[in-house]
Amino acid sequence: MSFLSKLRDRLTKSSSRISAGLDEVIGDAPAPAAPPQAAPAPAPQTPGVPHPPTPAVPRPAPDRPGLVDRLLGRETAPAEPRRELDDAMLEDLEDMLIAADMGTDTALRVTANIAEGRMGRRIGATELKQALADEVTRIMTPVARPLPLYPKKPQVVLVVGVNGSGKTTTIGKLASQFRAAGKKVVIAAGDTFRAAAVEQLQVWGQRAGVPVMVAAHGSDPASLAFDAMTRAEAEGADLLMIDTAGRLQNRADLMEELAKIVRVIRKKDPTAPHNTLLVLDATTGQNALSQVETFRKLADVSGLVMTKLDGTARGGVLVALADKFGLPIHAIGVGEQIDDLDAFDAGEFARALVGL
Protein backbone atom coordinates (compact mmCIF):
# COMPACT_ATOMS: atom_id res chain seq x y z
CA MET A 1 0.00 0.00 0.00
CA SER A 2 1.41 3.43 -0.96
CA PHE A 3 1.93 6.04 1.73
CA LEU A 4 -0.83 8.18 0.16
CA SER A 5 -3.24 5.26 0.45
CA LYS A 6 -2.21 4.77 4.07
CA LEU A 7 -2.63 8.48 4.73
CA ARG A 8 -6.17 8.45 3.34
CA ASP A 9 -6.99 5.20 5.13
CA ARG A 10 -5.49 6.05 8.51
CA LEU A 11 -6.31 9.73 8.76
CA THR A 12 -9.93 8.70 9.07
CA LYS A 13 -10.46 10.13 12.55
CA SER A 14 -9.46 13.62 11.45
CA SER A 15 -11.01 13.41 7.98
CA SER A 16 -14.26 11.91 9.28
CA ARG A 17 -14.55 14.64 11.90
CA ILE A 18 -13.88 17.46 9.44
CA SER A 19 -15.84 15.93 6.55
CA ALA A 20 -18.85 15.28 8.78
CA GLY A 21 -18.49 18.77 10.22
CA LEU A 22 -18.57 20.34 6.75
CA ASP A 23 -21.65 18.28 5.85
CA GLU A 24 -23.31 19.51 9.04
CA VAL A 25 -22.40 23.12 8.24
CA ILE A 26 -24.22 22.79 4.92
CA GLY A 27 -27.06 20.79 6.47
CA ASP A 28 -27.68 23.44 9.13
CA ALA A 29 -29.15 25.78 6.53
CA PRO A 30 -32.81 26.68 7.04
CA ALA A 31 -35.03 25.53 4.20
CA PRO A 32 -35.58 28.41 1.76
CA ALA A 33 -39.06 29.84 2.17
CA ALA A 34 -41.28 29.40 -0.86
CA PRO A 35 -42.50 32.70 -2.34
CA PRO A 36 -46.16 33.39 -1.49
CA GLN A 37 -48.54 32.35 -4.25
CA ALA A 38 -51.01 35.05 -5.22
CA ALA A 39 -54.59 33.78 -5.31
CA PRO A 40 -56.08 33.96 -8.83
CA ALA A 41 -58.67 36.69 -9.30
CA PRO A 42 -62.25 35.32 -9.59
CA ALA A 43 -63.62 35.30 -13.13
CA PRO A 44 -66.33 37.90 -13.71
CA GLN A 45 -69.83 36.47 -13.61
CA THR A 46 -72.02 37.16 -16.67
CA PRO A 47 -75.72 36.74 -15.85
CA GLY A 48 -77.57 34.20 -17.93
CA VAL A 49 -74.52 32.87 -19.77
CA PRO A 50 -73.67 29.28 -18.95
CA HIS A 51 -69.98 28.60 -18.21
CA PRO A 52 -68.27 25.84 -20.12
CA PRO A 53 -66.94 23.03 -17.93
CA THR A 54 -63.34 23.45 -16.74
CA PRO A 55 -61.12 20.95 -18.54
CA ALA A 56 -59.35 18.47 -16.28
CA VAL A 57 -55.67 19.23 -15.78
CA PRO A 58 -53.62 16.05 -16.22
CA ARG A 59 -51.49 15.13 -13.20
CA PRO A 60 -47.78 15.57 -14.02
CA ALA A 61 -45.96 12.29 -14.42
CA PRO A 62 -43.31 11.63 -11.79
CA ASP A 63 -39.73 12.27 -12.85
CA ARG A 64 -38.20 9.07 -14.12
CA PRO A 65 -34.80 8.30 -15.56
CA GLY A 66 -34.62 8.02 -19.33
CA LEU A 67 -35.00 4.68 -21.07
CA VAL A 68 -31.25 4.23 -21.58
CA ASP A 69 -30.55 5.06 -17.92
CA ARG A 70 -33.19 2.58 -16.81
CA LEU A 71 -31.83 -0.13 -19.09
CA LEU A 72 -28.33 0.42 -17.67
CA GLY A 73 -29.60 0.52 -14.11
CA ARG A 74 -28.65 4.17 -13.61
CA GLU A 75 -30.66 6.41 -11.34
CA THR A 76 -30.68 10.17 -11.27
CA ALA A 77 -28.48 11.33 -8.38
CA PRO A 78 -30.27 13.52 -5.84
CA ALA A 79 -29.26 17.15 -5.88
CA GLU A 80 -26.54 18.03 -3.35
CA PRO A 81 -27.83 20.16 -0.46
CA ARG A 82 -26.69 23.75 -0.67
CA ARG A 83 -26.54 26.65 1.73
CA GLU A 84 -26.04 30.36 1.26
CA LEU A 85 -22.60 31.41 2.45
CA ASP A 86 -23.45 34.12 4.96
CA ASP A 87 -22.14 35.28 8.34
CA ALA A 88 -23.99 32.51 10.19
CA MET A 89 -22.48 29.82 7.97
CA LEU A 90 -18.99 31.31 8.37
CA GLU A 91 -19.41 31.21 12.14
CA ASP A 92 -20.43 27.53 11.96
CA LEU A 93 -17.39 26.81 9.78
CA GLU A 94 -15.05 28.61 12.18
CA ASP A 95 -16.42 26.66 15.15
CA MET A 96 -15.94 23.36 13.30
CA LEU A 97 -12.31 24.15 12.36
CA ILE A 98 -11.48 25.24 15.90
CA ALA A 99 -12.96 21.98 17.22
CA ALA A 100 -10.64 20.12 14.80
CA ASP A 101 -7.64 21.80 16.53
CA MET A 102 -6.87 24.19 13.71
CA GLY A 103 -6.69 27.01 16.23
CA THR A 104 -8.68 30.24 16.42
CA ASP A 105 -6.34 32.48 14.41
CA THR A 106 -5.86 29.96 11.61
CA ALA A 107 -9.58 29.14 11.49
CA LEU A 108 -10.46 32.82 11.13
CA ARG A 109 -7.96 33.32 8.30
CA VAL A 110 -9.08 30.18 6.48
CA THR A 111 -12.78 31.04 6.65
CA ALA A 112 -12.11 34.63 5.53
CA ASN A 113 -10.27 33.35 2.46
CA ILE A 114 -13.00 30.82 1.69
CA ALA A 115 -15.60 33.60 1.92
CA GLU A 116 -13.77 35.78 -0.60
CA GLY A 117 -15.72 35.67 -3.86
CA ARG A 118 -18.30 33.26 -2.44
CA MET A 119 -20.34 35.37 -0.01
CA GLY A 120 -24.02 35.30 -0.84
CA ARG A 121 -23.70 32.24 -3.08
CA ARG A 122 -25.34 28.93 -2.37
CA ILE A 123 -22.64 26.26 -2.15
CA GLY A 124 -22.61 22.53 -1.46
CA ALA A 125 -20.41 20.36 0.73
CA THR A 126 -18.21 19.24 -2.18
CA GLU A 127 -17.32 22.81 -3.14
CA LEU A 128 -16.75 23.69 0.52
CA LYS A 129 -14.43 20.71 1.03
CA GLN A 130 -12.45 21.59 -2.09
CA ALA A 131 -12.17 25.22 -0.98
CA LEU A 132 -10.91 24.11 2.45
CA ALA A 133 -8.44 21.67 0.87
CA ASP A 134 -7.13 24.49 -1.34
CA GLU A 135 -6.64 26.75 1.69
CA VAL A 136 -4.87 24.03 3.68
CA THR A 137 -2.62 23.31 0.69
CA ARG A 138 -1.80 27.02 0.36
CA ILE A 139 -0.77 27.18 4.03
CA MET A 140 1.17 23.91 4.04
CA THR A 141 3.02 24.06 0.72
CA PRO A 142 5.77 26.47 1.88
CA VAL A 143 6.65 24.21 4.85
CA ALA A 144 6.54 20.84 3.06
CA ARG A 145 10.28 20.23 2.76
CA PRO A 146 12.16 16.93 3.12
CA LEU A 147 15.07 16.76 5.54
CA PRO A 148 17.95 18.39 3.62
CA LEU A 149 21.10 16.36 3.06
CA TYR A 150 24.44 18.16 2.92
CA PRO A 151 27.80 17.12 1.48
CA LYS A 152 29.36 17.74 4.91
CA LYS A 153 30.23 14.46 6.66
CA PRO A 154 29.02 13.59 9.15
CA GLN A 155 25.80 15.58 8.98
CA VAL A 156 24.75 15.86 12.63
CA VAL A 157 21.01 15.62 13.30
CA LEU A 158 19.97 16.43 16.87
CA VAL A 159 16.50 15.03 17.64
CA VAL A 160 14.45 16.58 20.45
CA GLY A 161 10.92 16.12 21.82
CA VAL A 162 9.02 15.18 24.94
CA ASN A 163 9.03 11.60 26.17
CA GLY A 164 6.32 9.58 24.46
CA SER A 165 6.20 11.71 21.32
CA GLY A 166 7.60 8.95 19.13
CA LYS A 167 11.07 10.49 19.05
CA THR A 168 13.04 7.26 19.45
CA THR A 169 10.92 5.41 16.88
CA THR A 170 11.28 8.30 14.44
CA ILE A 171 15.07 8.16 14.73
CA GLY A 172 14.99 4.43 14.03
CA LYS A 173 12.72 4.83 11.00
CA LEU A 174 14.73 7.71 9.52
CA ALA A 175 17.99 5.84 10.06
CA SER A 176 16.56 2.74 8.38
CA GLN A 177 15.30 4.76 5.42
CA PHE A 178 18.60 6.61 4.98
CA ARG A 179 20.46 3.31 5.23
CA ALA A 180 18.20 1.83 2.54
CA ALA A 181 18.99 4.87 0.37
CA GLY A 182 22.68 4.05 0.57
CA LYS A 183 23.68 6.44 3.36
CA LYS A 184 25.99 5.40 6.17
CA VAL A 185 24.34 6.24 9.50
CA VAL A 186 25.42 6.20 13.14
CA ILE A 187 22.95 6.60 16.04
CA ALA A 188 23.84 7.93 19.48
CA ALA A 189 21.41 6.89 22.24
CA GLY A 190 21.72 10.16 24.15
CA ASP A 191 18.73 9.71 26.46
CA THR A 192 20.99 7.91 28.91
CA PHE A 193 18.48 8.03 31.80
CA ARG A 194 15.83 5.98 29.94
CA ALA A 195 16.89 2.38 29.50
CA ALA A 196 13.79 1.66 27.41
CA ALA A 197 14.75 4.33 24.87
CA VAL A 198 18.26 2.90 24.55
CA GLU A 199 16.93 -0.63 24.09
CA GLN A 200 14.41 0.54 21.49
CA LEU A 201 17.13 2.26 19.47
CA GLN A 202 19.27 -0.86 19.65
CA VAL A 203 16.40 -2.91 18.22
CA TRP A 204 15.95 -0.45 15.34
CA GLY A 205 19.71 -0.42 14.75
CA GLN A 206 19.80 -4.20 14.50
CA ARG A 207 16.91 -4.20 12.02
CA ALA A 208 18.54 -1.59 9.80
CA GLY A 209 22.16 -2.59 10.17
CA VAL A 210 22.97 0.78 11.74
CA PRO A 211 25.42 0.99 14.67
CA VAL A 212 23.98 2.43 17.89
CA MET A 213 26.38 3.96 20.38
CA VAL A 214 25.30 3.66 24.02
CA ALA A 215 26.71 4.69 27.38
CA ALA A 216 26.23 3.57 30.96
CA HIS A 217 22.86 4.38 32.50
CA GLY A 218 22.77 7.98 33.74
CA SER A 219 26.10 8.94 32.18
CA ASP A 220 26.80 12.30 30.53
CA PRO A 221 24.94 12.56 27.16
CA ALA A 222 27.39 15.20 25.92
CA SER A 223 30.31 12.82 26.40
CA LEU A 224 28.46 10.15 24.41
CA ALA A 225 27.74 12.68 21.65
CA PHE A 226 31.45 13.54 21.44
CA ASP A 227 32.41 9.86 21.18
CA ALA A 228 29.74 9.34 18.53
CA MET A 229 31.11 12.28 16.52
CA THR A 230 34.59 10.75 16.71
CA ARG A 231 33.32 7.37 15.50
CA ALA A 232 31.16 8.87 12.75
CA GLU A 233 34.13 10.86 11.44
CA ALA A 234 36.47 7.86 11.59
CA GLU A 235 34.01 5.61 9.75
CA GLY A 236 33.09 8.21 7.12
CA ALA A 237 29.43 8.22 8.12
CA ASP A 238 27.05 10.42 6.17
CA LEU A 239 24.73 11.05 9.11
CA LEU A 240 24.96 11.03 12.89
CA MET A 241 21.56 11.03 14.60
CA ILE A 242 21.62 11.94 18.30
CA ASP A 243 18.68 11.09 20.55
CA THR A 244 18.12 13.39 23.53
CA ALA A 245 16.14 13.47 26.76
CA GLY A 246 12.58 14.77 26.74
CA ARG A 247 11.96 15.59 30.38
CA LEU A 248 10.17 18.93 30.59
CA GLN A 249 9.51 18.73 34.32
CA ASN A 250 12.79 20.55 34.95
CA ARG A 251 13.37 22.76 31.93
CA ALA A 252 16.48 24.40 33.34
CA ASP A 253 18.29 21.06 33.58
CA LEU A 254 17.13 20.01 30.12
CA MET A 255 18.19 23.33 28.62
CA GLU A 256 21.65 22.96 30.14
CA GLU A 257 21.89 19.34 28.95
CA LEU A 258 21.02 20.28 25.35
CA ALA A 259 23.31 23.31 25.44
CA LYS A 260 26.18 21.15 26.68
CA ILE A 261 25.65 18.60 23.89
CA VAL A 262 25.83 21.41 21.33
CA ARG A 263 28.95 22.92 22.92
CA VAL A 264 30.75 19.58 22.96
CA ILE A 265 29.95 18.53 19.38
CA ARG A 266 30.99 21.98 18.16
CA LYS A 267 34.47 21.23 19.44
CA LYS A 268 34.55 18.62 16.68
CA ASP A 269 32.56 20.65 14.13
CA PRO A 270 31.76 24.35 14.73
CA THR A 271 28.81 24.14 12.30
CA ALA A 272 27.05 21.26 14.12
CA PRO A 273 24.30 20.38 14.67
CA HIS A 274 23.26 20.80 11.05
CA ASN A 275 19.62 19.95 11.80
CA THR A 276 17.60 20.01 15.00
CA LEU A 277 14.39 18.04 14.56
CA LEU A 278 11.46 18.40 16.94
CA VAL A 279 9.22 15.33 17.02
CA LEU A 280 5.58 16.05 17.95
CA ASP A 281 2.71 13.74 18.87
CA ALA A 282 -0.46 14.68 16.96
CA THR A 283 -2.68 13.30 19.72
CA THR A 284 -1.64 16.17 22.00
CA GLY A 285 -3.62 18.63 19.87
CA GLN A 286 -3.06 22.30 20.67
CA ASN A 287 -0.42 21.34 23.25
CA ALA A 288 1.88 20.74 20.28
CA LEU A 289 2.04 24.52 19.76
CA SER A 290 3.30 25.10 23.29
CA GLN A 291 5.88 22.34 22.79
CA VAL A 292 7.22 24.13 19.72
CA GLU A 293 7.49 27.37 21.68
CA THR A 294 9.29 25.60 24.54
CA PHE A 295 11.79 23.69 22.41
CA ARG A 296 12.56 26.73 20.28
CA LYS A 297 13.84 28.29 23.50
CA LEU A 298 15.72 25.13 24.51
CA ALA A 299 17.24 24.38 21.09
CA ASP A 300 17.49 25.96 17.66
CA VAL A 301 14.70 23.87 16.10
CA SER A 302 15.11 23.69 12.32
CA GLY A 303 12.24 21.38 11.38
CA LEU A 304 9.33 19.23 12.57
CA VAL A 305 8.21 15.62 12.35
CA MET A 306 4.59 14.85 13.30
CA THR A 307 3.78 11.33 14.49
CA LYS A 308 0.61 9.37 15.37
CA LEU A 309 -1.65 11.08 12.84
CA ASP A 310 -3.46 7.75 12.51
CA GLY A 311 -4.57 7.77 16.15
CA THR A 312 -6.22 11.16 16.49
CA ALA A 313 -9.03 13.39 15.25
CA ARG A 314 -6.70 16.37 15.74
CA GLY A 315 -4.92 16.45 12.39
CA GLY A 316 -5.87 20.11 12.05
CA VAL A 317 -3.13 21.01 14.54
CA LEU A 318 -0.56 20.50 11.77
CA VAL A 319 -2.21 23.36 9.85
CA ALA A 320 -2.05 25.57 12.94
CA LEU A 321 1.66 24.76 13.40
CA ALA A 322 2.46 25.65 9.79
CA ASP A 323 0.43 28.86 9.95
CA LYS A 324 1.91 30.06 13.24
CA PHE A 325 5.57 29.03 13.05
CA GLY A 326 6.37 28.37 9.39
CA LEU A 327 8.92 25.70 10.37
CA PRO A 328 9.64 23.03 7.74
CA ILE A 329 7.62 19.84 8.19
CA HIS A 330 9.97 17.11 7.05
CA ALA A 331 7.89 13.98 7.62
CA ILE A 332 4.66 12.63 9.09
CA GLY A 333 3.90 9.26 10.63
CA VAL A 334 0.70 7.23 10.34
CA GLY A 335 1.66 3.93 11.96
CA GLU A 336 4.28 1.70 13.54
CA GLN A 337 5.90 0.18 10.45
CA ILE A 338 9.10 1.57 8.96
CA ASP A 339 7.30 2.75 5.80
CA ASP A 340 4.59 4.48 7.86
CA LEU A 341 6.87 7.54 8.08
CA ASP A 342 7.28 9.51 4.87
CA ALA A 343 8.05 12.95 3.50
CA PHE A 344 5.24 15.45 4.02
CA ASP A 345 3.16 16.34 0.93
CA ALA A 346 0.88 19.35 1.41
CA GLY A 347 -1.69 18.53 -1.28
CA GLU A 348 -2.05 14.87 -0.30
CA PHE A 349 -2.43 15.80 3.36
CA ALA A 350 -5.03 18.50 2.63
CA ARG A 351 -7.22 16.21 0.55
CA ALA A 352 -6.97 13.37 3.06
CA LEU A 353 -7.76 15.78 5.91
CA VAL A 354 -11.06 16.97 4.42
CA GLY A 355 -12.07 13.55 3.07
CA LEU A 356 -11.68 14.15 -0.67
State each model region's role.
Residues M1-I139, R145, K152-K153, A180, ...:
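Non-catalytic terminal/linker segments enriched in charged/polar, low-complexity residues
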Residues D105-L108, A133-L356:
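P-loop/Walker A NTP-binding module and the surrounding RecA-like catalytic core of P-loop NTPases
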